[in-house]
Amino acid sequence: MDMKKLIERINFLYKKSKEEGLTKEEKVEQQKLRREYIDIIKGNVKVQLEGVEKIPTPNRKN
């Protein structure tokens, strides 16, 4: 699922839960979508961190 649609659906289910409540199926869907979102974010952070290189600093005497 596209990230924008994923976030829109998560937000829709959140608002619906506050206004009228969710069915059992919608609660399961909400949990699944939230987990998918978290996994995507964690994957993105991991990729970014793997691309980071440590730059050695020269030894300084103060």
Swiss-Prot record:
Task: Tell me, in one coarse class, where this protein mainly resides.
Answer: cytoplasm
Q: Which Gene3D superfamilies match?
A: Helix hairpin bin
Alphabetically sorted, this entry's keywords are: Cytoplasm
GO cellular component term, pick one: cytoplasm
Recorded hits in SUPFAM superfamilies, A to Z, give: YnzC-like
Q: Where in the cell is it found?
A: Cytoplasm
Does the record carry Cytoplasm as a key word? yes
The record's section on InterPro entries has: DUF896
Q: Which family does it belong to?
A: Belongs to the UPF0291 family.
Put simply, this protein is called: UPF0291 protein CLD_1956
